[in-house]
Amino acid sequence: MTTVQEIIEYVETLTGHGINRDEGLQHGEGSRTVRGATVAWMASPDAIRAAGEAGHDLLIGHESLYFPYDVVNAVEPPADWRAWPVNRQRYELLERYGLAFARLHGSVDEICIFDTFAGLLGLGDPVYVDGLVKVYAIAPRPVRQLVDEVKASTGMPHLRVAPAGALDQIVRRVGLPWGGLGLFVNVGYQQRLIAQGCDVFIAGESDSYGFRFAAECGIPMIETSHEVSENPGLRHFTTMLSQAFPDVAFRFYENPCIFEIVL
């Protein structure tokens, strides 16, 4: 029978290195036998309930289990973080359903999340690769057209766009600050793409600082959302796990984009 730890070790064989500091078992026992497992972008209450009601033993989450971000590894976390209602609810639900929780973050980005997002957008092979810094060449087109193409690819009816000028600006080299790489805390990633001649970004999640960083470099940014940019890769990862561990019933739970645009 497959254990939680064996699933984690399998991920390490795919990346060729140990899991990252923010990854690993964060609730339950690593020696636990897994007969059913749910994979989700985040261990939201609905995701935990879905795993529990399916009778699963394990919930694999891509994002931080608790707030503030990665608090379980924080050097000086807020003294009362466990009592925060959002954290207490998640903990109590995991306990109620008897679930183990493992976080698999950057490892799955490496394995398939980034490339699946690029494939969803129809970008083909990158023209520059340095780890997860990748640049894609496209036929020259106006930003407005690229926005419409991203809408069609993602199924999102509306997108936030920081155009950095006119929407008729012609672009030809795409960078992908997927997930949270478009946020202000990750502008260093944007700069690495800029250094390779990117002239447009298709991002997961961004914010005003992140948008402004790109705009002041003359680079328009098209935002999808953190979830939308990573869910397809996590669905693919679920299939990979199913093939690697046929004795375990894996299921993907889709965390929807949390916000709505009200016109």
Regions found by a protein language model. Give the residues of each.
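Active-site catalytic microenvironments in core metabolic enzymes, especially phosphate/sugar-handling
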Residues: 1-263
